[in-house]
C-alpha cells in the first residue's frame, strides 16, 4: 500500500468519532422513508465541513442530496441510506425486546450505519484525490426512502446515475461478503375507492360500498394468479377498510398492491392487468376510484468485475474482530431466535463448495459473530427481494459489500438489529465499510483498464437498456 493511500485511509480512523456520532444520532431519532429531514441535515453539514460541494433537494426530492469533490473522470459514486422502519423501537445494547417508545420507529435494517460507512469512504477518497493530484471525482449520494419510496429509482428516471463511471455501496448484515446475482423488480400502486355512505339496514340500496370494491378487486386478483407466470408475485394490504361500524355502507376504502417479477418490463405488464381489475371492481361496486402510483424498482444487474475488486479490497482491509464482551452480547442475542441451520452467505445458497467452507468458518454455525470473509462468489443466482440499488446498476456498473454489524443469524427488520445499532459491533462495521469501499474506489481511480473492464461488462449485460418502473408524472410519496 503506497503512503498516499495509507494516509487517505487513515482519515477514517482520524475522523472515526465523527462517523459513529452521525450514525448514533440518526439511530436516536429514527425517521421514516422520505421524512429523513434531521438525518439529511446531519449529512449535509458534515459534508460541508469535510470540504465537499453539497447539492440539496437532489432530483426534486427533499431529503436527497449529494456531496462531491474533485474534477474530471473517473466519477465514482458512493451510495448512502438513512431511513428507519416503523414499529421497531428498541433500546440499545439490551438483549430482550424493550422499546424506547412503544410502537415507535427503529433502525431495523441498519441504515444509520450504511450512510455513515459510505460517508467515511467518500472522505477517504477525497483525501486521496487531494494528496495524489490525480484526476477524478468522488460523489457521496444521500439516498432516502429505500424502505419505501425508491428514491434511487426516481433519481434513475432523471438519468442521474448515467453520470457516474461506477457506483459502490454496502449494507449492514450478519456476514462479510460481496453481494452478487439478481433479484425481483417491483411496482407499488395504491387504489382508493370512493362510494356512497348509507345505513346498511335502513337504506342499503342507496349505498355504494368502497369496501365492496376493495374486496371485489382482491377476488379478481386472486383469479389472476392462475394466469401469470411462476416468476411473478402479487402482494396486497388493505390500508383503509372504511371504518369499524358494520351498519354503515363504507364510503371510502383503500388497498395497496405490489407486483413483482424477475424483469421490470414484466412487472409493468402485470401492473397493467391489476389496474384493469381495479377498474372492473369499481364498475361492479358502483364506486369511483383513484389510482396513486407509489414506487417501483428494477432488478439488479451484477458486475463480476467490480465484485472481484470489492472482495479483494475487503480482504486487504480485513474484517472486524471482536472482544470477549462483544461476543458475550452477541451470544445473548443469538439465544433470542432459533439456531441457524443454513450455512451463512449468498454463495452458500448456490455453490456447495462455498457452503462447506462457510460451515467450517462459522464452526457449523455456532459462532456468535461471523468474524471471517466469505469466499468470493459471483453468479447469476436469484434473490427474491427488491432494492432500488437495482436501478442504479442499470445506469452504471455497481457493486455492494455486506459487512457484519449484528450477530450471526439475526434476521433483518428485527428488534435485535436495532439493539445492535449503537454498539461497538455496529461502529466497527462502519469503519470497515469505509475502508473497504474507499480501497475499491481508489483502485478504480488508479487503474483505468480495470474500470474499462467493469464498464464493458456492464454494457454487455444492459443490452437494450433500462426500463424505468417509475411513471413519468409520479412523485415520491411517503406512505
Model-predicted regions and their roles:
Residues 4, 15-18, 22, 35-46, ...:
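General structural feature for long, well-ordered alpha-helical segments within catalytic domains
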Residues 26, 47, 67, 78, ...:
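Divalent metal-coordination and catalytic microenvironments
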Residues 63, 85-87, 95-106, 112-113, ...:
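Histidine/acidic-residue-rich, glycine-tolerant segments that coordinate divalent metal ions
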Residues 77-79, 88, 194, 401-404:
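Non-cysteine beta-strand/loop elements that form the S-adenosyl-L-methionine
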Residues 215-479:
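Metal-dependent amide/peptide-bond hydrolase catalytic core
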Amino acid at each position: 500500500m503506497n503512503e498516499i493511500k495509507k494516509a487517505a485511509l487513515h482519515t477514517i480512523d482520524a475522523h472515526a468519532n465523527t462517523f459513529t456520532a452521525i450514525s448514533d444520532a440518526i439511530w436516536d431519532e429514527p425517521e421514516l422513508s422520505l421524512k429523513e429531514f434531521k438525518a439529511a441535515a446531519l449529512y449535509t453539514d458534515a459534508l460541508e465541513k469535510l470540504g465537499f460541494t453539497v447539492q440539496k433537494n437532489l432530483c426534486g426530492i427533499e431529503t436527497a442530496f449529494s456531496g462531491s469533490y474533485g474534477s474530471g473522470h473517473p466519477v465514482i459514486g458512493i451510495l448512502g441510506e438513512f431511513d428507519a422502519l416503523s414499529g421497531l423501537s428498541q433500546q440499545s445494547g439490551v438483549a430482550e425486546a424493550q422499546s424506547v417508545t412503544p410502537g415507535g420507529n427503529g433502525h431495523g435494517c441498519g441504515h444509520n450505519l450504511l450512510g455513515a460507512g459510505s460517508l467515511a469512504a467518500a472522505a477517504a477518497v477525497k483525501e486521496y484525490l487531494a494528496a495524489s493530484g490525480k484526476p477524478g471525482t468522488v460523489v457521496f449520494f444521500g439516498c432516502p426512502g429505500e424502505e419505501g419510496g425508491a428514491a434511487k429509482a426516481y433519481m434513475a428516471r432523471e438519468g442521474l446515475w448515467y453520470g457516474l463511471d461506477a457506483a459502490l455501496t454496502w449494507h449492514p448484515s450478519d456476514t462479510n461478503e460481496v453481494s452478487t446475482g439478481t433479484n425481483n423488480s417491483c411496482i407499488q400502486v395504491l387504489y382508493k375507492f370512493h362510494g356512497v355512505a348509507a345505513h346498511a339496514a335502513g337504506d342499503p340500496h342507496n349505498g355504494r360500498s368502497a369496501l365492496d370494491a376493495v374486496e371485489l378487486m382482491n377476488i379478481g386478483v386472486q383469479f389472476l394468479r392462475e394466469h401469470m407466470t411462476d416468476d411473478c408475485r402479487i402482494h396486497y394490504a388493505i390500508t383503509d377498510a372504511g371504518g369499524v361500524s358494520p351498519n354503515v355502507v363504507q364510503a371510502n376504502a383503500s388497498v395497496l398492491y405490489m407486483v413483482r417479477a424477475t424483469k421490470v418490463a414484466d412487472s409493468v405488464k402485470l401492473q397493467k392487468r391489476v389496474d384493469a381489475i381495479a377498474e372492473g371492481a369499481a364498475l361492479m361496486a358502483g364506486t369511483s376510484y383513484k389510482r396513486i402510483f407509489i414506487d417501483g424498482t428494477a432488478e439488479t444487474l451484477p458486475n463480476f468485475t467490480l465484485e472481484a475488486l470489492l472482495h479483494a479490497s475487503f480482504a486487504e482491509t480485513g474484517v472486524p474482530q471482536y472482544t470477549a464482551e462483544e461476543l458475550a452480547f452477541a451470544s445473548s442475542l443469538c439465544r433470542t431466535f432459533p439456531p441457524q441451520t443454513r450455512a451463512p452467505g449468498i454463495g452458500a445458497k448456490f455453490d456447495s463448495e462455498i457452503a462447506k467452507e462457510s460451515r467450517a468458518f462459522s464452526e457449523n454455525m455456532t459462532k456468535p459473530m461471523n468474524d471471517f470473509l466469505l469466499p468470493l462468489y459471483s453468479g447469476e443466482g436469484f434473490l427474491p427481494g427488491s432494492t432500488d440499488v437495482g436501478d442504479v446498476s442499470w445506469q452504471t456498473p455497481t457493486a455492494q459489500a455486506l459487512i457484519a454489524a449484528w450477530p450471526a443469524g439475526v434476521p433483518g427488520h428485527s428488534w435485535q438489529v436495532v439493539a445492535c445499532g449503537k454498539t461497538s459491533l455496529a461502529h466497527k462495521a462502519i469503519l470497515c465499510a469505509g475502508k473497504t469501499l474507499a480501497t475499491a474506489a481508489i483502485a478504480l481511480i488508479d487503474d483505468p483498464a480495470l474500470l474499462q473492464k467493469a464498464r464493458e461488462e456492464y454494457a454487455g449485460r444492459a443490452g437494450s437498456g433500462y426500463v424505468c418502473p417509475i411513471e413519468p408524472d409520479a412523485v415520491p410519496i411517503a406512505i
